[in-house]
Amino acid sequence: MAPPLNSTTSNLIKTESIFDLSERKFKVKGFPLFHDVPENVSFRSFSSICKPSESNAPPSLLQKVLAYSHKGGFFGFSHETPSDRLMNSIGSFNGKDFLSIFRFKTWWSTQWIGKSGSDLQMETQWILIEVPETKSYVVIIPIIEKCFRSALFPGFNDHVKIIAESGSTKVKESTFNSIAYVHFSENPYDLMKEAYSAIRVHLNSFRLLEEKTIPNLVDKFGWCTWDAFYLTVNPIGIFHGLDDFSKGGVEPRFVIIDDGWQSISFDGYDPNEDAKNLVLGGEQMSGRLHRFDECYKFRKYESGLLLGPNSPPYDPNNFTDLILKGIEHEKLRKKREEAISSKSSDLAEIESKIKKVVKEIDDLFGGEQFSSGEKSEMKSEYGLKAFTKDLRTKFKGLDDVYVWHALCGAWGGVRPETTHLDTKIVPCKLSPGLDGTMEDLAVVEISKASLGLVHPSQANELYDSMHSYLAESGITGVKVDVIHSLEYVCDEYGGRVDLAKVYYEGLTKSIVKNFNGNGMIASMQHCNDFFFLGTKQISMGRVGDDFWFQDPNGDPMGSFWLQGVHMIHCSYNSLWMGQMIQPDWDMFQSDHVCAKFHAGSRAICGGPIYVSDNVGSHDFDLIKKLVFPDGTIPKCIYFPLPTRDCLFKNPLFDHTTVLKIWNFNKYGGVIGAFNCQGAGWDPIMQKFRGFPECYKPIPGTVHVTEVEWDQKEETSHLGKAEEYVVYLNQAEELSLMTLKSEPIQFTIQPSTFELYSFVPVTKLCGGIKFAPIGLTNMFNSGGTVIDLEYVGNGAKIKVKGGGSFLAYSSESPKKFQLNGCEVDFEWLGDGKLCVNVPWIEEACGVSDMEIFF
């Protein structure tokens, strides 16, 4: 609990009113924001609703929230009749630019813009409105009250609707006093920080990112097995995959063993036998967990099997053949469903073809002959523990091994009567609010099969049973997926809020006990109730839908346009998710047609960088522009956000906007400009599709003032320099800029990018100007400069990495020392100062430079 309010704290609560609701108008500093506000809608100030003395927020955070509490308040509304789902307008607006985030699938959210309440999409998580009359911004965030969760929806005649739902026909309410939070600021980035800080103090059910520790893998390079193997993942493939990277000169510091390692079985089959020979995602989604340890593929692994000279080989061609057969099987399954629904006479023929393909798949698996399955009389270790121990023996730099699991165990939950837990098959019921979302295979399969739900009273045991075994087996963390399936099965369990609370509490306790309190990546979690209820301890999560290397619906251009869509998801979602979790931009494949496009964004994402390359399919030259030989990365010190001029634009299909995102390094800023045009959300078709007419070169501008220097305390001074050097990483160009300079003009080709590094110029004695840019062979050049000190008439610099170091210097140095030895350097008349830097393994790749003038 926070300390009780004293006179000092009380003085922080200002009484100035920003908002006013009267005469059916909701006003901001006297200017109407919403018109036609219904009589049953209320607005109450933050201080009249929130009880700071009951908050568990740290005193420093509490004081900050109280200092700007006058800038926020709550919408409420009342109905005469209680219900489990209540809908109400909160007023109408038109002619004002807004940015919003909406759920396009159960699990995923993305950006949307418009000018009126009717332009909103369903399941909107928040709306940020520009108020030009006051040169300010207002955000409206539907939140949680009592046992109800809320979201915004479009209404008729420019109205904004709010819907509050419990998810249970037994949990009803009629009145809400604080179902949505409203906040005002003149800075859109401050706005999001302040708003979520205020909600954190009010709800007391989650914590901000600044209050938590981030997983160790945040500044490292890793590999995820999903696109490399799908459900065929096994120890041999993982071992050879890691060995590939090692031989290529890059050491993954973490590996995520994705779906395919668990012990699942299907209803109607032997509950004690693992499902075998699964290939593609989708097949497993009706499967249920029947034991907490690894499946047969990993269970029979014998210690030392892959360490000796005669270790089993891995055949990537076999994987390719399996994928082709898996695709054939999937198409036949769809045809079978169509034949059943249409009562087609072709059904028998289709069934025959399915049997044939299944046999061919079984033959390709070949019985997984890398182990006899017979445990030797020698004292060998078997299973996951033996495997992780062998991985660490072979790959010394491997710090973390994570595994995948669904929030409810497996996609289909836990199979009743197979474990010690009280489990029940619960039919799935989707909220009406999800009707307008994109068709999703996972939703279809889970809904069809229902969910094996462990009774909420045993949620603690569910997670500890899984995680304690994993921790003992050498696993250091988990990627938890399918998080919002709980909302499908909450009717009998007190509704979506109460059920989620219990499950998230159990998950939190287990992460603390088994995985150092932070060994988790959240995924498929883009709904507001997860963030408001599930992030007390969880500090990292995905901020975009999956990396799709091609369009599953068959558009051949999807290989290109889907990548821009992914960047939009991640950039705009970070505006809100980044307040509570470290944004994770997901994996990509280094040999993909748009791999370089992805790599440019990952270079400045401020989080871990990981790929899902197939074994033997890598672009090591590209990877080495992102990753040091020791598997660490030159990480930005914040997470990237869209520049102000992109906030109310559509960088996907407006023909004119290049996505620009800004971030910080220790001694400078960076802006990435990405041409994502060519695709986007189609509200009529209710899916993402290509807009080929937009896939073209786009012009734009960039300026140093677009870096929001004041958003991090340690970088605020960098925004006050008289002059900056600007380095274009792709064009390899260098120029100077002041705060009053004209912006740099550019034209970005489709699915390409440019990275602009901005470094303050320092004047040394005699008027010499100097600024270190970093290693230009790395995409995030500025991230390679880890220490900088100006001493007398010179500079001392620590640089991590090997390659070509570049600085701006208005005059040629008299001497350049590298690691204590004088070295040759190149100085050009345009100010480019270059020197070659070796990677020194003994110094962890860090070199000391001294430059004398």
Swiss-Prot record:
Pathway: Glycan metabolism; stachyose biosynthesis; stachyose from raffinose: step 1/1
EC number assigned by the record: 2.4.1.67
Role played: Catalyzes stachyose synthesis by transfer of a galactosyl moiety from galactinol to raffinose. Also catalyzes verbascose synthesis by galactosyl transfer from galactinol to stachyose or from one stachyose molecule to another. Oligosaccharides of the raffinose family play a protective role in maturation drying of seeds. They may act as cryoprotectants in frost-hardy plants.
Catalytic activity: alpha-D-galactosyl-(1->3)-1D-myo-inositol + raffinose = stachyose + myo-inositol
UniProt source species: Pisum sativum
Protein name: Stachyose synthase
Cross-referenced PANTHER family: GALACTINOL--SUCROSE GALACTOSYLTRANSFERASE 4-RELATED, PTHR31268
pH dependency: Optimum pH is 7.0.
Record InterPro entries: Glycoside_hydrolase_SF, Glycosyl_hydrolases_36
Signal peptide as annotated in the record: none
A Gene Ontology term for the protein's cellular component: cytoplasm
Coiled-coil boundaries: none
A UniProt-annotated Pfam family: Raffinose_syn
Annotated family: Belongs to the glycosyl hydrolases 36 family.
Catalytic class of the enzyme: transferase
Residue ranges listed under propeptide: 1-11
Keywords: Carbohydrate metabolism, Cytoplasm, Glycosyltransferase, Transferase
Localization: Cytoplasm
GO molecular function: galactinol-raffinose galactosyltransferase activity
A biological process from GO: oligosaccharide biosynthetic process
Main location: cytoplasm
Source species taxonomy: Eukaryota, Viridiplantae, Streptophyta, Embryophyta, Tracheophyta
